[in-house]
């Protein structure tokens, strides 16, 4: 197996040809920069799983672009006509200020000496740009820096809701959420989900990555969410070899113990920046198959490789909903090697039961594809299509293996409601399960233009661009932040901030 693509030189960031090939049971990316020499990285830690995920490839399409093709991908973001996926989740960095000073971070205002903080009106315009997409961007995440250091965050959340975003998410370290009244204020403003930085269940990951033990704060946030009835938290561990890769199972168990408020976990393997020697890179790289193996080992086989699917495996469901409603829908058309997930139910005794153990997922996806073809050929009425699916669904469920706590009829009803384009049913369906996922964002070493073109997680910027996640962080972030930043000392004078090290304010 050998594929040709384009990548980046990790040193000069120039676009260079690359080859993706199988080597010793793994998928490797190799490339040569005329100036800086050869580079080799692990693209995918298991060749067989790579091939299995390949069959779920789904090419999307976009109708609205903001930039023209001039220099070619990944320099023309965006979105440019080369892109293949509309925005599913948009990030807006509302500030680069932070109330932490993490050893591994070099991008916050304290380290850079500059403050990037778009105004309320800037952010409103960025959100308007996102809603102009076809279909309009459904979900938005306020990020940073640490977004909770902005005093107008509740107003931004309310504005997003008023503008029609179905899902408003907050990426946070959780420090300010230990204040229960502040949490209540965010909930009242319309916050949907807390995307909580959560590096592990022991002190070590926090001491290494954050410089202090933040675990008690994370636990306090979960406790506060229970008190105020905020029941949508996603734990977000940055996965680092030798730091917290031994805590994957423990994090999953912790989420299961708090499944009344924790909706899921999204593991993110660490990215590499700067000059990294090949030995360090190959030994430290965690790919999606590596993550899956860690899950299987550390859950004692309760969750296995067979339970995980690539993100675009569900894209045909969106296509069917589009055909039934005659309306464009957001489609998870990311590259098949960008992310993976599974859903598990937590039984009464705490046992983890993946949905694949009692529902024939492949069978359901086949039915969906069949109905898409039938609608295309015969213009079947939506009621008839849904009726036929409803008749077939029970045969895909093994009641003997289903968790006792699960109301199967309710699950079937919710699935049918989702096919009718009922977003509230989709949200309720998630409340019955725990999502376990992994998104492997790229860096300059494993960068693949073909993956970037299919990205559906984007950044909105003050210059009316919408930029894929991995190109923003690898290429465009510095340019955008420099263009729209002011010196830290000037910002402090403008806001009458004093003191040398006021972590609560910057």
UniProtKB/Swiss-Prot annotation:
Entry's transmembrane regions: none
Effect of residue 77 to A: Loss of C9-methylation but C7-methylation is still observed
Pfam families given in the database record: Fer4_12, Radical_SAM, Zn_ribbon_HMPTM
Documented EC number(s): 2.1.1.-
Binding note for cofactor: Binds 2 [4Fe-4S] clusters. The clusters are coordinated with 3 cysteines and an exchangeable S-adenosyl-L-methionine.
Gene3D superfamilies assigned: Aldolase class I
N-terminal signal peptide: none
Keyword match 4Fe-4S: yes
InterPro entries attached to this UniProt entry: Aldolase_TIM, GDGT/MA_synthase, Methyltransferase_Class_D, rSAM, Zn_ribbon_HMPTM
Gene Ontology biological process: methylation
GO molecular function list: 4 iron, 4 sulfur cluster binding; metal ion binding; methyltransferase activity
Chain positions recorded as [4Fe-4S] cluster 2 binding sites: 98, 102, 105
Keywords (A to Z) from UniProt: 4Fe-4S, Iron, Iron-sulfur, Metal-binding, Methyltransferase, S-adenosyl-L-methionine, Transferase
Cofactor requirement: [4Fe-4S] cluster; S-adenosyl-L-methionine
Binding site for [4Fe-4S] cluster 1: 73, 77, 80
Start and end residues of each Radical SAM core domain: 82-300
Function in brief: Catalyzes methylation of 7,8-dihydro-6-hydroxymethylpterin, likely using methylenetetrahydromethanopterin as a methyl group donor, via a radical-based mechanism.
Family to which the UniProt record says this protein belongs: Belongs to the radical SAM superfamily.
Entry protein name: 7,8-dihydro-6-hydroxymethylpterin dimethyltransferase
